[in-house]
Every structure is written in C-alpha cells, then in structure tokens.
Amino acid sequence: MRWCLAVVAGALLGACPFLSYGLLHMGVVALVVPWVARRWAPTVVAGAVVVLAVIAWGAAGFWLWDGIEATREQWAAGSGTGRPYLYFLAADVVLLGVLVGPAGAGGLTRVARLDRPARALVLVAVGSALLGALSGFERGEVERIWLPLACWVAPAAAALVDPGRATAWRWWLVAQGAATLVLATVLRSPW
C-alpha cells in the first residue's frame, strides 16, 4: 500500500508544474514529509514518477522549461517590465503576508513554539516563497504563485495560541476576519 501511495503522490506532484508554474515550489514543500518521517525509500519512488511525468509531457510535445521560458518572454513583452525587480521582490513578500493574514504573519514571529513537523513545513514554505521571489521568475504572478504556498504558511498562526491565555486566539480570529473584510471591500482587481 505504501508503494501505491508513493506512486500516486509522485503522479500528483508530477502534474503540479503543468497546472501552474507556481506549483513548482510544491516539490520543495513535499520534501518536508520524508524529512520529518525519515522515510526516504517511498520518496525515491515518488521522485522517479515525477521525473517520468515530466518526460511523458515532453514526449507528448510540451517541454516544461520551454513553457517557463515562453512565460518569461510573454511577461517581458507586457506592462510589467516598467517596474523594477525590487518592486516585485518587495510586493511579492508583502502580498504573501496579506494572503496569510495578520494571524499567519504574526505566527511567523513565534514559529519556534510549533512542534517539529509543523515548524519544518512552515519554514520550508516560507523559504520556498523567498527563493521564488529572489529568482525573479514570478514577477506580477502573486495570486497564482503564492496562494498554494500561503496554505502551508498559514499554520504558523497556531503558534499564537498561548496555553496560559486560552482566549487570546479570539482576537487573532477577529483580526483575520477584519483584514479579509477590508481587503474584499477595498481591493479592486481587473481579474
């Protein structure tokens, strides 16, 4: 059964970059599971299936790296070129904070309180997001790139729960809801 799950996991992870280039980061996040569980044999099987998926897509006529390069060229021909790299670097990091909300961002300051698996997941997701921002590939693609990673950064909010003050989490929940309402009311997007 474990090997079947490894094959299914590899097939799903292998499909990720073909659904959205933003899901390329999920390969790094997925490595947290075997690192924490210390089970590398199923990971090797899943990794082989990922490689086979990329090769199969290539044999079918879609080479991943050509698609990434075409996306970069299309971005270079668009209106985003008028903004400097540092703009996108700052905007991407700020918008990741907006996506996880005040509780998620606040939880990052106390991430050491989380247990080892949760802490590893959150830190690897944040690290993957920062590497993506530093690479400059995701300029102007915040909603597609960061949303999948934000789901793995948001558990940092669990670090805000103080066992001595069991009701403190309520204020973080209020802040999260208020931030969502403000963003939904104020933000206008052409998409």
Question: Which stretches of residues belong to each language-model region?
Answer:
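Structural signal for the C-terminal ends of transmembrane alpha-helices
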Residues: M1, L31-A41, A59-A60, G106-D115, ...
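Perimembrane helix-loop-helix junctions
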Residues: M1-V7, L13, L24-V49
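Membrane-interfacial loop-to-transmembrane alpha-helix junctions, especially the N-terminal start
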Residues: R2-L5, L114-A125, D162-L173
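Transmembrane-lumen/periplasm boundary regions of multi-pass, lipid-linked membrane glycan transferases
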Residues: A46-R113
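Signature aromatic-anchored transmembrane alpha helix within multi-pass, membrane-resident enzymes
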Residues: A48-V51, G164-S189
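Hydrophobic/aromatic-rich transmembrane helices and adjacent perimembrane loops
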Residues: L89-G101, G140-G164
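Transmembrane-helix signature of polytopic, lipid-linked glycan biosynthesis machinery
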Residues: A125-E141, A156-A159, T180-S189
